[in-house]
From Swiss-Prot:
Expressed in nurse cells and oocytes (at protein level). Expressed in the brain. Expressed in the neuromuscular junction (NMJ). This is F-box/SPRY domain-containing protein 1. Pfam families: F-box-like (PF12937), SPRY (PF00622). Component of an E3 ubiquitin ligase complex composed of hiw and Fsn. Interacts with Rae1, probably as part of the hiw-Fsn complex. Interacts (via B30.2/SPRY domain) with vas. Interacts with Cul1. Belongs to the FBXO45/Fsn family. Residues 3-51 form the F-box domain. The gene is Fsn. Disruption phenotype: Dramatic overgrowth of synaptic termini, with a large increase in the number of synaptic boutons and branches. Also impaired synaptic transmission. It comes from the Eukaryota. Pathway: Protein modification; protein ubiquitination. Residues 61-253 form the B30.2/SPRY domain. Coiled coil: none annotated. Required in the presynaptic motoneuron to down-regulate the levels of wnd and restrain synaptic terminal growth at the neuromuscular junction (NMJ). Negatively regulates the localization of vas to the posterior pole of the oocyte. Involved in primordial germ cell formation.
Length: 255
């Protein structure tokens, strides 16, 4: 019979030890034994709470931006998948909350940003929230590392080459390799995007497809035949002082 006092003591000791480890180390610890796996599998445990409160900006924890990720562990994961301050146009900066990009009001420029982590395997979904005016062109989608992040003029930068795929929210057009690939979604009088709406981007690296959801409604597959390359969440914007947030959600739920 397990002594409940000893079990509680062991739990508290593990909690303290795991709180001082790096996140990569925690991943390795979860593979040591069933006991440690079950301990770390509690995504709202004090261990994940401690790491969440110490690594995430307080501003993001106080806002409703992370409403779609309910546990401490998923909030941490979203933070490490957010926009990269090192992989964006010089006219873009990432706000202190870590999840929102701000495009500076630079004339005759189109500017883009990529997420910190790209995907080549599995199925992934993330939310994009355009929190400022769209301007004449506002594109969300994916790109490889080779896709450009800045160009002259006000254009649909994302989707302008063979390294990027995008949905222009202003005109409801799909874009790739500099060509319009058709209207999207395929609905009669499809409603235009409203600022503040959450769009879910669904990347399936097994079926090589990209799809979108809005207001929990699946809008259909937008792109097929995606290459076997690492693909990154990406947006491109033209409007000065507009802001776009991105929250990684993990594996999409079917149904």
């Amino acid at each position: 019979m397990v002594d409940p006092v000893a079990a509680l003591c062991n739990y508290n000791v593990l909690e303290v030890i795991f709180s001082y480890l790096e996140l990569d180390d925690l991943s390795h610890c979860s593979q040591v034994c069933k006991s440690w796996y079950h301990f770390l599998n509690d995504e709202n445990s004090d261990v994940w709470r401690w790491h969440c409160l110490n690594k995430l900006p307080k501003e993001s924890l106080k806002s409703d931006l992370l409403a779609s990720v309910s546990t401490y562990k998923t909030k941490l994961r979203a933070y490490f998948h957010a926009w990269s301050p090192n992989d964006c146009s010089r006219n873009v900066y990432i706000k202190p909350n870590g999840f929102t990009l701000h495009r500076n009001p630079v004339a005759q420029s189109t500017d883009a940003a990529r997420g910190k982590i790209g995907f080549r395997h599995g199925r992934h979904t993330w939310e994009v929230i355009w929190e400022g005016p769209l301007g004449t062109v506002a594109v969300i989608g994916i790109s490889t590392k080779e896709a450009a992040l800045q160009c002259h003029g006000y254009v649909a930068l994302l989707g302008s080459d063979d390294q990027s795929w995008g949905w222009n929210l202003v005109e409801n057009h799909l874009l790739h390799n500099g060509d319009m690939q058709g209207s999207y979604p395929l609905l009669n009088n499809a409603p235009k995007y409203q600022v503040g709406e959450r769009i879910r981007v669904i990347l399936d690296c097994e079926d090589n497809t990209l799809s979108f959801e809005k207001n929990y409604e699946f809008l259909g597959v937008a792109f097929r035949g995606l290459p076997d390359k690492k693909l990154y969440p990406t947006v491109s914007a033209v409007y000065g002082n507009t802001e776009v947030s991105m929250v990684y959600l993990g594996t999409p739920l079917d149904g």
